[in-house]
UniProtKB/Swiss-Prot annotation:
Originating species: Azotobacter vinelandii (strain DJ / ATCC BAA-1303)
Protein name in UniProt: UPF0260 protein Avin_32930
InterPro entries to which the protein is assigned, alphabetical: Puta_zinc/iron-chelating_dom (IPR005358), UCP006173 (IPR008228)
Pfam families, sorted: CxxCxxCC (PF03692)
Family classification: Belongs to the UPF0260 family.
Amino acid sequence: MAAKVEPFWKRKTLDRLDAEEWESLCDGCGLCCLQKLEDEEDGSVYYTRIACRLLDLETCRCRDYANRRRSVPDCIQLTPAQAGEFQWLPPTCAYRLLAEGEDLPLWHPLVCGDPQAVHRERISRAGRMLSESAVAEDDWEEHLIFRAG
């Protein structure tokens, strides 16, 4: 009987993942592509339901992922070197969970095999976001949905 091999995210630290493994950790929720506001007093990060102009509001995927940083220069590219700073990511985010020593949730596509589970379980904001082009930046505070961390 062959020994059961643990999935890569249980066997490797974030800094040991190859590019394909790293990218596959993204569950496609799109939450990291929502506009965020930082409380100037305590540094808390609040997510809004205002999405980056490149985010498809239904699929929660970037419409130009390969070139996103050209179109949106302040788009944040997550790297293993930043793992200690992932507290601003949603508490359901695989990058944050693994950086904090947690496992992936049952609905994560790598666990259940279904990329639509993140939407069915309503982890993503599919269909419940607004494009940043539709809301004045001064009005973003009216669209807060949760606090990270």
